[in-house]
Amino acid sequence: MKLPIIAVIGRPNVGKSTLVNRIAGDQQAIVHDQPGITRDRTYRPGFWQDRNFQIVDTGGIVFDDHEEFLPLIREQAAIALAEAAVALFVVDGQAGLNAADQEIADWLRQQNVPVVLAVNKCESLEQGYTQAAEFWELGMEEPFPISAIHGSGTGDLLDKVIEYLPTITDVEEDTTINVAIIGRPNVGKSSLLNALTGEQRAIVSPISGTTRDAIDTIIERNGQQYRLIDTAGIRRKKNVDYGAEFFSINRAFKAIRRADVVLFVIDVLDGVTEQDLKLAGRIIDEGRAVIIVANKWDAVEKDTYTINQYRKELQARLFFMEWAEMLFISAQTGQRVNKILDLVDQAAESHRRRVSTAVINEVIQEAVSWHSPPTSRQGKQGRIYYGTQVRSQPPTISLFVNDPKRFNDSYRRYIEKQFRQDLGFAGTPIRLVWRGKRVRDAERGTPNRATKV
């Protein structure tokens, strides 16, 4: 069941993201003293007085500045209000009431949503009520003095906010598939997000680095929900300034860890760059399922053999991801975008799958019968006693052997290939853990001696 939404609204640098982090209980929205850090709308789960909800952090609203992003930020805020049960209007108690606050208040009155006014940066109780008093002029009913940094006043504020939330009696088990959209700056991640959602969800601009936060949106298809996480483009370290962009890149890496499946977006015109390779390595290290999305295919001059040529070139560079599905798309025109979620379903199922020990050992027996383990120069042959899956996400199989050193890389790749081929693992890494075990211990630990190989 969809949770009710609280939209956080206000001008830049009044502490909206700090308040969202306070309510959500951890630091995920980027907090920095530079105005305009949050550009897109960012969804976070929240809980208060036995009530579950989502809280949406939006970009700072400005009406008298005509920079490129500002109309887009207002559009994102308007979309957040359209789906919200209540708006949380944040102002700066230290700066006091100003014309920008009044403009936002007038704009909010035009929206069909109740508003609760939070006067932030009130660091003491006595001063807080004095600072909040002048905001009665906005005509937004009672202003609540709070300190988002220290948490004072936020309890009373939330008590008021949840009065506007609809009651949810049943919350279904979360079977949502988390999908992180990852790639270098300006490869088309936000355009892909918009193509998947069918709306202008993230700010799209030809300027590299438009998206700063890892932002979430939920879509549903055939009863399956997907949480799409668009992230800041990841640059080379020497091109990263300490500050907002540094935090965004760390947030993107955290988004990879949150994901079940990563859409690894590559600019097909650039091919696989060194930064792409490093990013691919990070995805592999985190053990995420992957779909390689080769974007901007509409800009390539093609003939009958073009796609095969490009596929071979990309696979040669990403040889360590040979198990990942590769899709050539155009986020701009929508070409093949409709195939992405089918591949996501397949990869997520493989990533979460658990296989019985009996089946794993059948695969091992078959593999060994076709290709025996290598023999050392001293005439000692490797031997696999049995295997068992010890975890999923990614599938991890422990193989108990007489001596791990007797199994070279070639044979290990062969065994992994057999698991993929026989068990149908697609789009996910498989981790094989080779463990040494004495014969007697192996026989004692084998779940079924008939499966020994």
From Swiss-Prot:
GO biological process annotations for this chain's record?
ribosome biogenesis
Q: What Pfam families does the record tag this protein with?
A: KH_dom-like, MMR_HSR1
Q: Where does GTP 1 bind?
A: 10-17, 57-61, 120-123
Look up keyword GTP-binding and say if it applies. Answer: yes
| Subunit (UniProt) | Associates with the 50S ribosomal subunit.
Concerning InterPro entries, the annotation shows: G_ENGA, GTP-bd, GTPase_Der, KH_dom-like, KH_dom-like_a/b, P-loop_NTPase, Small_GTP-bd
GO molecular function of the protein, one example? GTP binding
Describe the location of the KH-like domain by residue ranges: 353-438
Name-wise, this protein is GTPase Der
Q: Which organism is it from?
A: Picosynechococcus sp. (strain ATCC 27264 / PCC 7002 / PR-6) (Agmenellum quadruplicatum)
Say yes or no: keyword Cell membrane present.
Answer: no
Binding-site residues for GTP 2, renumbered to this chain = 183-190, 230-234, 295-298
Under the heading Gene3D superfamilies, the entry gives: 3.30.300.20, P-loop containing nucleotide triphosphate hydrolases
The record's similarity note reads: Belongs to the TRAFAC class TrmE-Era-EngA-EngB-Septin-like GTPase superfamily. EngA (Der) GTPase family.
The EngA-type G domain extends over 4-169, 177-352
Q: Which PROSITE patterns match?
A: G_ENGA (PS51712)
Keywords noted in UniProt: GTP-binding, Nucleotide-binding, Repeat, Ribosome biogenesis
